[in-house]
Regions:
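Mid-length scaffold segments of soluble, non-membrane domains
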Residues: 71-112
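Short, solvent-exposed aromatic-acidic interface loops
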Residues: 164-167
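Active-site-adjacent substructure of cysteine-protease-like catalytic cores
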Residues: 100-161
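Short secondary-structure junctions and interdomain/linker hinges
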Residues: 61, 96, 116-117
Length: 167
């Protein structure tokens, strides 16, 4: 395999989840769409079409986006989990679920020119949790969840380029 560069910034078209399409809890699919477009996929797909075509579920983010990306809902864990998001992304291009991979593996992907959707907390704040009704049971889950797209890395400074669809 060829040696990887020390630094790489992936040319990524920025897409906001707030304007012109207002999808205040649609960070995961918005980040994915930026990543797809950065790789040359989904060039003709606009955010609203992408959000509307995404798999949905009444309450279970493992089965589809829980709730609506257009409407905050305190009673629902409004997100879509990585495996289902990656499955959706594969309709448009080469997408992998990198859940549980090491930081070094993520850095290698970035230096290889592959953007990575990462699940973080909103504004990088301390995580906080609440209990959600999940069908016939309850689960305590992260409340201030957010997703952004890593689209660059510098191994000399250990800094990342981040495309945050909310900011």
């Amino acid at each position: 395999a060829p040696a990887l560069p020390d630094r790489r910034v992936i040319d990524t078209p920025y897409i906001s989840q707030v304007t012109p399409v207002y999808a205040p809890v649609g960070c995961e699919p918005t980040s994915l769409l930026m990543g797809l477009k950065a790789k040359g996929y989904a060039q003709e797909v606009d955010l609203r079409s992408f959000l509307d075509a995404m798999p949905k579920h009444e309450y279970d983010p493992a089965q589809g986006f829980a709730g609506s990306p257009y409407q905050p809902d305190q009673s629902k864990r409004t997100t879509i989990y990585p495996a289902k998001l990656a499955e959706y992304g594969r309709q448009y291009g080469d997408v992998a679920d990198f859940s549980g991979r090491s930081v070094e593996e993520l850095q290698r992907e970035l230096l290889s020119g592959n953007p990575v959707v990462v699940y973080v907390t909103l504004w990088w704040a301390e995580p906080y949790y609440r209990t959600y009704r999940m069908g016939d049971h309850e689960e305590t889950l992260l409340r201030n969840n957010h997703a952004v797209l890593l689209c660059g890395y510098d191994s000399q400074t250990d800094q990342y380029n981040v495309a945050d669809p909310y900011n």
